[in-house]
Design a protein with these regions (language model features):
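Cofactor-binding loop segments of dinucleotide-utilizing enzymes, especially the Rossmann-like FAD-
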Residues: 3-5, 36, 113-116, 149
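Short, highly charged low-complexity linear segments
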Residues: 78, 107, 136, 149, ...
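Short helix/strand-capping connector loops at secondary-structure junctions
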Residues: 145-155
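Short, glycine-/small-residue-rich phosphate/pyrophosphate-handling segment
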Residues: 88-89, 101-146
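N-terminal beta1-alpha1-beta2 submodule of the flavodoxin-like/Rossmannoid cofactor-binding fold
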Residues: 1-78, 84-100, 142, 156-174
């Protein structure tokens, strides 16, 4: 399951998702992409109802996405990096997993990050924030790969970079 949190269709992280998918499909894997931009996922209101019911009271697309996350063997989290953290779309999705995140066990996880910054070390804060969910909250989660898509600012700029090959190969070996 590839989760593209890019707010832009054809944005850099979204383009790398497609390359990852090509590689994974070449390896014979069945892959589904969720482009969060096309789904309605409201912010968590902190009401706490889900603590006892394991269901969110909000009527949006999160239940459908959550089912896919629970059933996936592999989850790719892809986000542009804004101010050295994940974008709002991915953070909102993660916050909304509270009712069922304990059902997401033994997942293999990958991260695809894109940023204008050219120094991959500066993206570690973003990786750590995603790991706070995947490795610290999901039982048995195993981190399988990270793509630091650095040095890309303009929409689609990543297409002329070596990051494309890296994304494809990461998918191929997923």
């Amino acid at each position: 399951l590839v989760i593209s949190a890019s707010p832009r269709k054809g944005g850099n992280s979204d383009v790398l998702c497609d390359e990852f998918i090509k590689g994974a499909q070449q390896a014979g894997h069945k892959v589904e992409k969720i482009f969060l931009r096309n789904f309605k996922v409201n912010y968590c209101t902190g009401c706490g109802v889900c603590n006892s019911t394991h269901k969110c009271v909000q009527k949006d697309d999160m239940a459908e996405i959550m089912d896919k996350m629970v059933n996936a063997d592999v989850i790719v989290f892809a986000t542009p990096v804004y101010f050295y953290t994940m974008d709002a779309q991915l953070k909102t999705l993660i916050d909304r997993t509270v009712p069922r995140y304990t059902e997401m066990v033994n997942k293999e996880v990958y991260y695809i990050l894109t940023a204008a910054d050219t120094n991959a070390a500066n993206l570690e804060k973003t990786v750590e924030s995603i790991r706070g969910f995947t490795l610290d909250c999901l039982d048995g989660a195993v981190e399988k790969g990270i793509l630091y898509g650095t040095g890309v600012w303009d929409k689609g700029e990543v297409q002329s970079s070596a990051h494309m090959k890296t994304a494809y190969e990461m998918g191929l070996h997923s």
